Amino acid sequence: MTRRHVVVMLTTSYPRFPGDTIGTFMEPIAKGLAARGHAVHVVLPWHPRLARGPVEDGVHFHPFRYAPHPDLNVFGYAASLRADTHLRGAAYMAAPLALAASWRAVRRVAAAVGATLLHGHWIIPSGAVVAAAAGHLPVVVSLHGSDVYVAERHALARLAAQAAARRLDWLTACSDDLRDRMIALGADADRAVTIPYGVDARRFRPDAVLRAEGRRAIGAGPDELVLFTAGRFVRKKGFEYLIDAIGRLAPRWPALRLVIGGGGDLDAELRARTGERGVADRVSFPGVLAQDAVAAHLAGADIAVMPSVHDDAGNVDGLPNTVMEALASATPLVATRVGGIPSVIEHDRTGWLVGERDAHALETAIEALLADPGARARLGSAARADVLGRRTWDAVAEAFEQVYDRAAGRAERRRQTD
């Protein structure tokens, strides 16, 4: 029988309002734990667009302010890094203020609600903060991607991550890659576990009505073949390689179209690249899509593609949300063999995996599926079945629940020996 935990989560990203695309995986983790009977309190930075009530679906929200000037509201919500590779100048000024404010907020909320456990999302900065604020409370830290990258490349961040790793009771990662990299930095392998993200299989589903809605939104005719991808326009998404692949495919597939949902620092560059490759009329950019719109676009697509890469600085996605959403939608998926992607895709059964930074490999895989509707149906059906069997958000919440119990048990043993 699991314990009932009073959890204070510290995070730098969370959907700021219903339908927001920032930190989308955080909401189902928090809501899933609350639905299983735990008291969940989320401490998060204030943001001008933050529109959360005090309690929603059993999750309590505690925003903290840190910026004396609006220009310094760059802590969290994917605002600290430029193209996910370099810290913005304002982030250097905001970070000390935000770290101090988040530490005070965690201590205040934990005392007020009688916390039994602290959970930091991203080891830098939240993991380091909860480790410093915990006292005797058990600490769980979750790795999501850019945190490990920052720790690997910046000495002060590395020292903070290593200090947090020594203090925490249990570590989770959304991919084996992140877990192994943090172990290489000093985390205890015996207290580190991989918990891949889940997906809302009710929202993301194969459905004729949803497919028709998506095709209308795309403006696709009945005979057109649609590829879909989505994400922030940053280097590690690898969208430029997909555009190059479309440039190669377009002459042979006149009915082929590509839709790239999202936005970000590379918007103008990606649009320009479509012109350079002669496919500006084949590639559309609908902007940042709400979750329901992503579901419709995936249902309306013939193939989903996630061309993630290690960027030039070495940063890589932990596990892109679009991968899980495509699998649940039964949309056949071509993805690169990087980060956490291989941990959720079995090649030639639930999707196709190719090497990164390889437009020719993307071209070959996409063309093979375009030419074989039977293979597309087979991959999509197997992917959907795999999601329903073990990759729902409830399964993820149960896995975190088990980690909480282990962390609490270890903290009790530690207190007995202190």
Residues of each region from the PLM?
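N-terminal subdomain of nucleotide-sugar transferases
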Residues: 1-66, 412, 418
